[in-house]
């Protein structure tokens, strides 16, 4: 089926990422399911920082230490431009922001779940030192559109 093909495609793309780079850092916990399914450690920055109303220097310090200890390769924004908080963490930690946003919690781009899965997978894979086969991902999206016509 198409969804099994999508799952296999994601596994194949993820396999191109060095194992030590398989850490997804984003603001919320929304990527936990994806991380569990495809072998990533996931880190929710809000778990470290608390909500923005309680932002304290020691929280920022522990977050910066975690980013360094985990050898994090990218921070994944959920919007572009990234929030001031993520931009500041990126600057202070020297961990780059991913060039594309990831779509979470119903914050959908124009499209559907296959398009979102392909987009998020390529964003994650390319940002963490892997190589995403965008052409085969686009083929999966085309199959989805044919089914939904």
List the predicted regions and their residue ranges:
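Extracytoplasmic metal-acquisition and chelation regions
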Residues: 1-149
């Amino acid at each position: 089926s198409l969804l099994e093909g999508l799952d296999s495609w994601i596994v194949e793309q993820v396999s191109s990422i060095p194992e030590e780079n398989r850490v997804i850092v984003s603001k919320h916990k929304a990527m936990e399911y994806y991380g569990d399914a495809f072998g990533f450690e996931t880190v929710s920055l809000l778990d470290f920082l608390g909500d923005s109303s309680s932002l304290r220097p020691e929280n920022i310090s522990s977050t910066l230490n975690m980013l360094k200890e985990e050898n994090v390769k990218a921070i994944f924004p959920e919007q572009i431009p990234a929030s001031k908080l993520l931009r500041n963490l990126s600057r202070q930690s020297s961990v780059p922001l991913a060039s594309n946003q990831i779509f979470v919690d119903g914050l959908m781009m124009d499209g559907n779940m296959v398009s979102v899965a392909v987009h998020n997978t390529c964003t994650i894979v390319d940002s963490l030192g892997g190589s995403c086969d965008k052409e085969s991902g686009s083929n999966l999206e085309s199959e989805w559109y044919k089914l939904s016509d």
